[in-house]
C-alpha cells in the first residue's frame, strides 16, 4: 500500500458514493447494539487463542504470487471455508509484471450466495517480493497474514450464530470474505505494478450479474467493503477515512468502549497499549487515504471502511515484519471488536446460549 496525500479526494469520493448508493438501492443501515450478555458471548465466551494460532501459523511463510508458498496458503484458506460449508470461488488470472507473466488467484468465500446483499471483509494474502542480504524472504506478518487469520477466525467463531440466522432487520444480508492476491508491487508502486488481484476482481464484477440480486452486478451487491491491513503489532491504531462510512467507524469505537467497560477485552492487550484506544474517534484522515485493495472498488462507488493501521506500524516493509514482532494479545482485542461488529451488522442472535464455546 502507498500513502496518498490529496486533500479533496475524500469529499469527492463521498459525493460519488452517495450518488451511486442511491442509484443501486443501498441503504444506510441502523446497526444492532448487543446486550451485556451478547457482548460477553461474542467477545469472551467465543474467544479461543489456540484456534486463532492454528489459522495464523500456516500464513507466516513467504507467499509471493505464483510460488509454492502462495499455493500452500491458498489451500489453507480454501480448505478452511470448505470445511465450514461456505461457497468458495477462485478468480484465477495471469498478468504481466516487472518479472514477466505471473499467475494470480483471488479467493471469495460466501456464507450464503443466495442472499442478495453482502457484508464484505477483505484482506490480501500475498507477501511482498523482498529478501534480506542472505536471501531470506520477507514474511509480512502484519502485511497481511494477521488480517487473513482474523477473518478466518471470525468465520469460525460466528459459525453457530450464522446457522441460527439473522433477525428480520438483516435477512437480506450475508457475510462474504475476499482474499486478494498481488496487492504488493514487485518493484515501484505504480498503476500497473500493484493491486493486481483487486483491480482484476473489481473489473470482472462490474459486468458480472449477481443472480441473487435482481439483475444488479456483483459490485452493487456489496453493502459495505471492510478492508483489513497492517494489523498485528502493539502500535496499531485506526482512524476514519471516509465520511460515507464514518457511522460504522463510530460503531467500532463504541464496541471497543463497551467491551472495555464490561472488562471483556484481553487485559494483556490493553496493558500493551498503555490504555490507548485502538479506534480513535477524534482522529479523521485529512488526506486522500492509502492506496490499497479498496481503491478499485472505491472508484466504482462501493462504500469503504478501511481498517489499516495509521501511522503505519514500525515494522512496515521491513524484514522485521515477522512473527517475533507480533503482539497476539492486541490482535485478540481487535478480533473481539471486529467479531462483535460483524455480528451486530448482521443482526445475529448473539444471546443464543447454544452458541457458547463448549
Where do the model's predicted regions map?
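Structural recognition of the beta-strand scaffold that forms the well-ordered cores
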Residues: 108-109, 118-122, 176-179, 223-229, ...
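Cleavable N-terminal signal peptides of Sec/SRP-targeted secreted and luminal proteins
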Residues: 4-22
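A non-catalytic alpha/beta surface segment that caps or lines the substrate-entry region
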Residues: 47-114
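Active-site-adjacent substrate-binding region
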Residues: 65, 224, 230-358
Amino acid at each position: 500500500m502507498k500513502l496518498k496525500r490529496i486533500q479533496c479526494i475524500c469529499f469527492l469520493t463521498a459525493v460519488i458514493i452517495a450518488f451511486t448508493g442511491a442509484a443501486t438501492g443501498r441503504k444506510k443501515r441502523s446497526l444492532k447494539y448487543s446486550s451485556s450478555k451478547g457482548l460477553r458471548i461474542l467477545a469472551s465466551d467465543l474467544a479461543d487463542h489456540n484456534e486463532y494460532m492454528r489459522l495464523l501459523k500456516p500464513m507466516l511463510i513467504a507467499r509471493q504470487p505464483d510460488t509454492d508458498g502462495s499455493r500452500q496458503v491458498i489451500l489453507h484458506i480454501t480448505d478452511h471455508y470448505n470445511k465450514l460449508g461456505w461457497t468458495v470461488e477462485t478468480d484465477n488470472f495471469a498478468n504481466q509484471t516487472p518479472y514477466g507473466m505471473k499467475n494470480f488467484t483471488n479467493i471469495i468465500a460466501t456464507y450464503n450466495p443466495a442472499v442478495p446483499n453482502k457484508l464484505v471483509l477483505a484482506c490480501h494474502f500475498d507477501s511482498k517480493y523482498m529478501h534480506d542480504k542472505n536471501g531470506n524472504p520477507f514474511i509480512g506478518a502484519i502485511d497481511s497474514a494477521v488480517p487473513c487469520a482474523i477473518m478466518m477466525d471470525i468465520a469460525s467463531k460466528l459459525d453457530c450464530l450464522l446457522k441460527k440466522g439473522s433477525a428480520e432487520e438483516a435477512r437480506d444480508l450475508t457475510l462474504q470474505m475476499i482474499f486478494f492476491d498481488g496487492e504488493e508491487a514487485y518493484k515501484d508502486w505504480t498503476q500497473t505494478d500493484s493491486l493486481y488481484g483487486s483491480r482484476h476482481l473489481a473489473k470482472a464484477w462490474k459486468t458480472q450479474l449477481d443472480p441473487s440480486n435482481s439483475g444488479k452486478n456483483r459490485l452493487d451487491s456489496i453493502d459495505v467493503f471492510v478492508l483489513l491491513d497492517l494489523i498485528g503489532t502493539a502500535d496499531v491504531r485506526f482512524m476514519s477515512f471516509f465520511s460515507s462510512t464514518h457511522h460504522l467507524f463510530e460503531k467500532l469505537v463504541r464496541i471497543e468502549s463497551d467491551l472495555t467497560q464490561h472488562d471483556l477485552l484481553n487485559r494483556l492487550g490493553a496493558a500493551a497499549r498503555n490504555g490507548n484506544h485502538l479506534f480513535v474517534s477524534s482522529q479523521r484522515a485529512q488526506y486522500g487515504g492509502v492506496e490499497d485493495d479498496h481503491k478499485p472498488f472505491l472508484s466504482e462507488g462501493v462504500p469503504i471502511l478501511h481498517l489499516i493501521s495509521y501511522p503505519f506500524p514500525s515494522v512496515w516493509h521491513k524484514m522485521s515484519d515477522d512473527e517475533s514482532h507480533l503482539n497476539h494479545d492486541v490482535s485478540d482485542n481487535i478480533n473481539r471488536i471486529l467479531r462483535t461488529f460483524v455480528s451486530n451488522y448482521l443482526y445475529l442472535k448473539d444471546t443464543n446460549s447454544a452458541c457458547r464455546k463448549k
